[in-house]
Amino acid sequence: MIRFAIIGTNWITDRFLESAADIEDFQLTAVYSRSAERAGEFAAKHNAAHAFSDLQEMAASDCFDAVYIASPNALHKEQAVLFMNHGKHVLCEKPFASNTKETEEMISAAKANGVVLMEAMKTTFLPNFKELKKHLHKIGTVRRFTASYCQYSSRYDAFRSGTVLNAFQPELSNGSLMDIGVYCIYPAVVLFGAPKDVKANGYALSSGVDGEGTVILSYDGFEAVLMHSKISTSYAPAEIQGEDGTIVIDTIHRPERVEIRYRDGRLENIAIPDPKPAMFYEAEEFVTLIKENKLESEENTFERSLTTAKIMEEARKQMGIVYPADQA
């Protein structure tokens, strides 16, 4: 049995725990919130025996083996390193950290302490993303990849009214690129590797974070054009265009409908049924790594997390988006 703690008492931790409930060797034993009352309420809700409002005290506790970090982006590195230095395995929400330097520090801490560290990028473990990879060769030489994750934020109305909530605060290393653009970039890295060049532009909000943008990754013979937005919504599918056909994906962050449209007019549906919650597979992978004494995922590798961090840092640089964490 792997005993888990969680940092964060929000909708994403609720969803993670609901997904992990189907994993036989998963047990939630500890909850952290800055509010002792909130920690206690969340622990009671999910039958966790321990509630903490002090991170140092929690890290030193022996009541859990691993921690799932779902705090604001700017806090990921500090919290992850703290827990790894106390011998705890860490599953950290995407994006791993604010920038490349912090990502490197997290990876170094994992290696130094001999613990598992994995970025919680759920997409790469989903059955239909794996099917996409399996059938990619059928479209011949790839000539273009397009993907978008554009979703009007539920917090943007407040921003427009003059209230800047966490989702749009540079102090927390937030913004469209970091929060949802990563769902386009990470799959591109998994499918095609590190790009030769990165070009980016976008719209900066008055708070100092990006509201939307486009990232173009250059590869040998093709480009990946990736669009992200928290101030508008897109319904366009993702496409991997090859010389012999095109793979059409309904949504890149959670593929459910995936088909190949061949140049000769044939249509092949390659999607498979997926009854599990989306976050189940990343939790299952993480638990398996711990049980098998493996320190790094073969799918969400350190190299892929670091490449993604480098791309996003370069994209932010070109957009003129600077976080306080960049100046630390």
From Swiss-Prot:
Induction: Is not induced in the presence of scyllo-inositol or myo-inositol. One of its GO terms (molecular function) is scyllo-inositol dehydrogenase (NADP+) activity. InterPro entries: Gfo/Idh/MocA-like_OxRdtase_N, GFO_IDH_MocA-like_dom, NAD(P)-bd_dom_sf. Keywords: NADP, Oxidoreductase. It catalyses: scyllo-inositol + NADP(+) = scyllo-inosose + NADPH + H(+). It is an enzyme of class 1 (oxidoreductase). It comes from the Bacteria. The keyword Oxidoreductase applies. The keyword Oxidoreductase applies. Its EC number is 1.1.1.371. Belongs to the Gfo/Idh/MocA family. PANTHER family: PTHR43054, SCYLLO-INOSITOL 2-DEHYDROGENASE (NADP(+)) IOLU. Catalyzes the NADPH-dependent reduction of scyllo-inosose (SIS) to scyllo-inositol (SI) in vitro, but is unable to dehydrogenate scyllo-inositol and myo-inositol. Is less efficient than the functional paralog IolW. Under physiological conditions, may primarily function as an NADPH-dependent oxidoreductase that reduces carbonyl group(s) in its substrates. Cannot use NADH instead of NADPH. This is scyllo-inositol 2-dehydrogenase (NADP(+)) IolU. It comes from Bacillus subtilis (strain 168). The lineage of its organism: Bacteria, Bacillati, Bacillota, Bacilli, Bacillales. The gene is iolU.
